[in-house]
A protein has these predicted regions:
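Aromatic-lined substrate-binding rim segments of carbohydrate-active enzymes
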Residues: 73-146, 214-219
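Aromatic- and acidic-residue-enriched carbohydrate-binding clefts of CAZyme catalytic domains
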Residues: 91-103, 108, 136-167, 360-384
Length: 498
């Protein structure tokens, strides 16, 4: 009888070399009051946020109080907390509160103070995005019509710079005074939930405007540990070191883009990478493409404010977000070195009625797209009517993981294999990364791409070369299933056992 020899299948071993991380940098951040009356302290280094001096991995979700019924705030906040959210972020849309100059409305579901008290009562921290310009798919980005169309200062353009005109800045100061009054007694230093504020949004002009807003905020009493800005778009000049913390983002789709095609930028969001920003964000309102200069990236921790929890639907670009689109994108952010996850949106809502107009973006006022007049559901994990979507549960598992292992992850930079960011649109390439402190860590794999089938990867294992020696995982090669994504631990110390 003839003897048949079979050739074993070729093993696809993927290799990465991990170096021991260098020391974190601290001492140059210009923060507000960092301690609360109980003595708890929030601070940061170049690597992560710190809580009482220990690495801290915050998990944040966006929920717009003025877009949701006041009577249902607490239920919505409790759903967020149950989903693993620790911090609530919210916009203060100027035109929701001062549609007519000098007539302020903080009543009902527009009551910021009551919302922050609800956050406190549920046990959630808060970051308030103060504007004056916000976006959020709101009419004029949140500018009241009387601001947008005023002849008392140079025209305020959503497409360009927000000017430093004295009369305009005086109006902004009154807005900040109102917001400061709403937050009085609720700041971190008072024992309240507000640990930070964001100044303006998606600003591309000179840095002195944002610095002026920071000074105004502090002057009217908004003294908080963290002052933030979006890490996009590129500004005219670099923000002075340590003044504001850039927060980043990435989305599964871009309903604001004029094209109906899938852009390369959106494909790029499903790989592990060094670049922190989704360059397609806010391409409708900014002519300057790209994130800010990342040459100083290592001076700041990689925190996000807008990891897409879904996407709104525009008239011309009617996207449908799959739960895996959201969960795998968040995993890619985590595997790329994120040390603080912020979802936009986490809880959907509905635009309030304006006194003189509807309050959504539209072609009628010069926007390049139309969206729904009332709904701001965003296909979020918690929807416009409080409904729980499948990706709520996908993200809850990821949030629980970040909550349990956040302190370890915050000490572990991301390392990418050679060529990880090249030919990223090729579905046959395996997308993976490692986060490690040089001894132990986590392996991240994303074999998923929105709107594109990703084939199984056969006979696969990984060789992780650490300072103390190499490790191959798993010992026996496996097949990575099509359209899958996951993370594995390695060498973790479990009460003395690795």
């Amino acid at each position: 009888m003839a003897l048949t020899l079979t050739t074993p299948p070729e093993v696809n071993t993927h290799v990465v070399t991990v170096l021991a991380p260098g020391p974190a940098i601290s001492g140059y951040f210009k923060l507000g009051s960092t301690r609360n009356p109980q003595g708890d302290e929030i601070s940061l280094t170049s690597r992560s946020l710190l809580f009482n001096g220990a690495p801290w991995f915050p998990i944040m979700g966006e929920f717009h109080f003025s877009r949701y019924p006041r009577a249902e705030w607490r239920e919505g906040l409790e759903k967020m907390k149950a989903g693993g959210i620790k911090i609530v972020s919210t916009y203060v849309f100027w035109n929701h509160h001062e549609e007519v100059e000098g007539e302020w409305d903080w009543a009902g579901q527009k009551d910021l103070r009551a919302f922050l008290e609800a956050c406190r009562d549920v046990g959630l921290l808060a970051i308030v995005r103060c504007g004056p310009w916000c976006n959020g798919e709101v009419r004029y980005g949140g500018f009241p019509d009387w601001v947008q169309n005023s002849t008392r200062w140079d025209p305020v353009s959503r497409w360009g710079l927000r000017p430093e005109h004295p009369a305009y800045m005086a109006s902004v100061k009154r807005l900040y005074q109102q917001i400061g009054s709403q937050m009085e007694g609720l700041l971190w230093k008072n024992g309240g939930p507000v640990i930070g504020i964001q100044l303006d949004n998606e600003y591309s002009g000179p840095s002195n405007y944002l610095l002026g807003l920071k000074n105004l905020a502090f002057e009217v009493g908004m003294d908080v540990p963290l002052y933030t800005k979006t890490g996009w778009p590129r500004m005219e000049d670099a923000m002075p070191e340590g003044e504001m913390i850039p927060l980043y983002g990435a989305y599964p789709d871009a309903a604001w883009e004029s094209s109906v095609q899938v852009s390369e930028g959106l494909l790029y969001n499903y790989i592990f990478r060094q670049q922190r920003i989704d360059e397609s964000i806010a391409s409708d309102v900014n002519t300057i493409k790209g994130g800010e200069d990342e040459s100083h990236r290592d001076q700041y921790p990689f925190l996000t404010a807008e990891t897409g929890g879904g996407m709104f639907v525009s008239y011309h670009r009617r996207n449908r977000v799959d739960p895996r689109d959201v969960a795998s994108l968040a995993l890619c952010q985590l595997g790329s070195g994120c040390v603080g996850m912020g979802y936009y949106m986490y809880h959907g809502g509905e635009n309030p009625d304006g006194r003189f107009s509807t309050l959504q973006k539209s072609n009628e006022i010069g926007d390049i797209f139309d969206i729904t007049i009332k709904s701001y559901d965003f296909q979020a994990p918690v929807g416009q009517y409080g409904q729980i979507r499948p990706h709520y549960n996908w993200l809850r598992r990821l949030n629980d993981f970040m909550g349990d292992f956040g302190a370890e992850l915050a000490r572990m930079p991301s390392t990418l294999p050679d060529g990880a960011e090249k030919d990223f649109s090729n579905p046959d390439n395996l997308r993976w990364s490692v986060r490690s402190d040089g001894v132990s860590g986590f392996l991240f794999v994303n074999n998923y791409q929105r709107l594109q089938r990703m084939p199984a990867k056969l006979n696969t294992n990984f060789q992780i070369v650490l300072p103390g020696g190499g490790q191959t995982i798993p010992r026996n090669p496996i097949t990575i299933p099509a359209d899958s994504f996951f993370c594995w631990p390695f060498n973790l110390d479990l009460n003395g056992v690795n």
